[in-house]
Amino acid sequence: MIIDGKNFGIDCFHSARIINCKNKSKRPQRYSHLAHALSKVKLTGHVMEFGVWQGKTLKVISDHFSNHTVWGFDSFEGLPEPWFMMSSQSGPRHPAGKFALAKEELSDVVNQFAKRKVNLVPGWFNQSIVSWLKDNPGVVSFLHIDCDLYSSTIDILTLLNSRIVPGTVIVFDEMYPWNNLERYDLWEQGEFQAVGEWIRTHQRTFRTLYRSEHQQCSIEVIV
C-alpha cells in the first residue's frame, strides 16, 4: 500500500505482509521481521541502527551486510527521558536511564564487533547525527530505528531526511502492539507520531513492506 501524509494512519500497516513466527515471544518475532526487511534492501548506501543496547539486532544486520560498514548509534546511557507505555500506570514503564550499559557491558558490546565492519557512534542522537553527517556523505540504504521514544525518532528522521531517498528501507521496532503480546496503550505518542509528522512535514511517500505479530513494521521510501 502506498502511504503519504493524507492517508497515513495505523490502518495503513494492516495491509503489510505479516511475518509469522512459531515462537511468539518478542525476540524471535523481531529477528524474523528484521531478516525479511533486510532482504528488501537493493539500494547502495549507509546502513544504520539507532538503539544498539547489547548489540543483538546490530549483529543480525552486520551478518547480512558482512562486507559493508554498519553504523550503530546509541548514547549507551539509557533512555534520555521516561518512556510511558500504559495510560493507567502511576509512573513510566521505562524511566530515564533505562537500558544504560555498565562499563563492563559496554566493553562486551565493543569487543563483539571488534572484528566486524561495525562503527559504534556514542552520544545523544541530536548531537551524534549532526557530527556524523559532516564526515559521511551519501544516502541511507537501511535504517533500523529502535529507540522507543517519539523525541528520538523524530530527531533521526528529521536530521537524516535529506539522506533518506527512494529505495531506503526503514524498520521501526515499536510502532503498534498488533496482537497485544505486550501492552502499549500510548503507541500514538511514540514512533507512530514521529513518522506521521515526518511524512507530512517533508511530503514523503512510502509503501509498507512487513509487520510482525508484535510491534515491528518496515517500509520502503518512494518519495
Residue ranges with predicted function:
Residues 19-32:
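Conserved SAM-binding loop and adjacent beta-strand
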Residues 4-22, 40-223:
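S-adenosylmethionine/decaboxylated-SAM
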Residues 29-45:
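Conserved alpha-helix/loop element of class I SAM-dependent methyltransferases that forms part
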